[in-house]
């Protein structure tokens, strides 16, 4: 254990967060996301909710200030989003500073970004459209 680092952050996740450079992206996915077929490094965080992990990492993680740092998947036509999912994520991310806007992109564009991500963290999140991409910024 380390002081001031949440016990929700595994050693593997801490290492990945430290190795990421500015502009690198990481996905925190729901339990249904096809992470293992996407290609990048996959970290398991079974049983944890995305919002809890976001709240744990945000004190350690600088969001990009030059490009939209938060991206979520848009609902497929005919499907509906649960607005409480985004609200919960925004609340978790605003623990350190005001939360930037979250951009929504279509499912296949999100999958393309996921294939190029530095890592994907699979959580136990069950919320539909519960995946979020974070783009790392420059630490001041």
From Swiss-Prot:
Gene3D superfamilies: RbsD-like domain (3.40.1650.10). Belongs to the RbsD / FucU family. FucU mutarotase subfamily. It is an enzyme of class 5 (isomerase). It catalyses: alpha-L-fucose = beta-L-fucose. The keyword Cytoplasm applies. It is found in: Cytoplasm. Substrate binds at residues 30, 107, 129-131. This is L-fucose mutarotase.
